[in-house]
Amino acid sequence: MARERQEMVVELKRYGISNARVLDAFLTVRRHLFVDAQSRPYAYSDNAMPIGFGQTISQPYTVAYMTSLLVERVPSGKVLEIGTGSGYQAAILAELGYRVYTIERIAGLYAAAGRVLDALGLPVHPRLGDGTLGWPEEAPFDGIIVTAAAPREPHTLMSQLAEGGVLVVPIGDLGSQQMTVIRRRGERFEHEIFHNFAFVPLCGREGWADNNE
């Protein structure tokens, strides 16, 4: 599916993604391995797709947009992803050379993503647990990416940023969120607000309640 990946990257460029490192990672990582057989023929379309358990793999543009926000501010280092999901975002981050830690709260997704990441030989450290609490034993992180909608600023995650570290997180209600970049400056935090997106909710002790639990 190399041709389909190339077409996806052309489309990402058309949508305004311009970072060469990010585009190269999207050319390399095989998205079709992170979706089920039924979705595989459409893996390189710019669409979110269900991955089970009420969760989705984000559309390529969204993943590229968030990744670009991180790469342009923190080009290397140790990164925490909240919400492993399919494992695709973690694979992109690993391809970019980050030391990747990722947390997933749903056991079925954690297991499935782990199998794919292991098969690809990617240096990703997965954990099953409540992502809203971060990974204090491995903190601080140079970057944190949250792949679900937070209802408010995630203060625990912010506290796990290294000096100068960056948190990329969609914040808002369940219908629409603003992509937000938060950078740590000592005990202060600088904020940048970007476009609106729609993500599945970030569930956990410091996120939304999970009505299925």
Swiss-Prot record:
CDD domains of this UniProt entry?
Answer: AdoMet_MTases
The role this protein plays is: Catalyzes the methyl esterification of L-isoaspartyl residues in peptides and proteins that result from spontaneous decomposition of normal L-aspartyl and L-asparaginyl residues. It plays a role in the repair and/or degradation of damaged proteins.
Query: What EC number(s) are associated with this protein in UniProt?
Result: 2.1.1.77
Please name the taxonomic classification of the source. Answer: Bacteria, Pseudomonadati, Chlorobiota, Chlorobiia, Chlorobiales
Concerning SUPFAM superfamilies, the annotation shows: S-adenosyl-L-methionine-dependent methyltransferases
Concerning Pfam families, the annotation shows:
PCMT
Q: What InterPro entries does the record tag this protein with? A: PCMT, SAM-dependent_MTases_sf
In the UniProt entry, which residues are flagged as the active site?
S58
Q: Which UniProt keywords apply?
A: Cytoplasm, Methyltransferase, S-adenosyl-L-methionine, Transferase
Please give the GO cellular component terms listed in this UniProt entry: cytoplasm
**Reaction catalysed?**
[protein]-L-isoaspartate + S-adenosyl-L-methionine = [protein]-L-isoaspartate alpha-methyl ester + S-adenosyl-L-homocysteine
Q: Which family does the UniProt entry place this protein in?
A: Belongs to the methyltransferase superfamily. L-isoaspartyl/D-aspartyl protein methyltransferase family.
Q: Which domain of life is it from?
A: Bacteria
Q: Name one GO molecular function term.
A: protein-L-isoaspartate (D-aspartate) O-methyltransferase activity
A single GO BP annotation from the record?
A: protein repair
Q: Which cellular compartments is it found in?
A: Cytoplasm
Matching PROSITE patterns: PCMT
Main site of residence? Answer: cytoplasm
Organism expressing this protein natively: Chlorobaculum tepidum (strain ATCC 49652 / DSM 12025 / NBRC 103806 / TLS) (Chlorobium tepidum)
Q: What is this protein called?
A: Protein-L-isoaspartate O-methyltransferase
